[in-house]
Curated annotation (Swiss-Prot):
The entry's keywords: Ribonucleoprotein, Ribosomal protein, RNA-binding, rRNA-binding
Gene Ontology terms describing biological process: ribosomal small subunit biogenesis; translation
PROSITE patterns: RIBOSOMAL_S4, S4
The name this protein goes by in its record: Small ribosomal subunit protein uS4
InterPro entries for this protein: Ribosomal_uS4, Ribosomal_uS4_CS, Ribosomal_uS4_euk/arc, Ribosomal_uS4_N, S4_RNA-bd, S4_RNA-bd_sf
Disulphides: none
Length: 185
């Protein structure tokens, strides 16, 4: 038996106060609005945003002419612009501090599939993605939390091997009905 060589880094952090009415209500609203599976997905987004804010705060504390601030600050802003989390016209580190969870959740594949009209609901979008019926470019993506880059957004489409795009491929319900019809004969 070999060793597991996976990187087990922290992906989320639980809240310090476990039971807060206001936070519960806000999280429940986000879960319903974005079709999340559980609260851990919100905590993961919150952790990512906190990490980005921490980097921005450290860069803002440095001198404006500091080469490290210029380099790392530009890298952070470029990454956020490429992901579409931060609009192109907001190119200062102060705007990173004003980001909310909704900004990050809007860039998830699940949300974009629903917004583009491939799915009837946000939950149906999750089912399509987990069923490997959505591809970004040439790659089939089955992770609903996949963050879509701005240049990849127009490339979101239905996969070729699905009953939705290819009428020759029977879906599960159609196969079951065909099978039941053959037994009656």
């Amino acid at each position: 038996m070999g060793r597991c060589l996976r990187n087990h880094s922290i992906t989320y952090k639980t809240p310090k106060v476990p039971y807060e009415r206001e936070r519960f209500d806000a999280e429940l609203k986000l879960v319903g609005q974005f079709g999340l599976k559980n609260k851990k997905e919100i905590q993961r987004v919150h952790y990512m945003l906190g990490h980005m804010r921490t980097i921005a705060k450290v860069m803002l504390m440095k001198d404006a002419k500091d080469p490290k601030r210029l380099l790392e600050g530009a890298a952070l802003l470029r990454r956020l612009h490429n992901l579409g989390i931060l609009p192109r016209d907001q190119n200062k580190l102060e705007f990173v501090l004003a980001l909310k969870e909704e900004n990050l959740l809007e860039r998830r594949l699940q949300t974009l599939v629903y917004r583009k009209g491939f799915a009837k609901s946000i939950h149906h979008a999750r089912v399509l993605i987990r069923g490997k019926m959505i591809k970004v470019g040439k790659q089939v993506v089955d992770v609903p939390s996949f963050l879509v880059r701005v240049e990849s957004e127009p490339l979101i489409q239905l996969a070729d091997n699905t009953p939705l795009t290819n009428p020759e491929i029977n879906g599960r319900r159609k196969r079951k009905n065909n099978h039941a019809g053959k037994e009656d004969n």
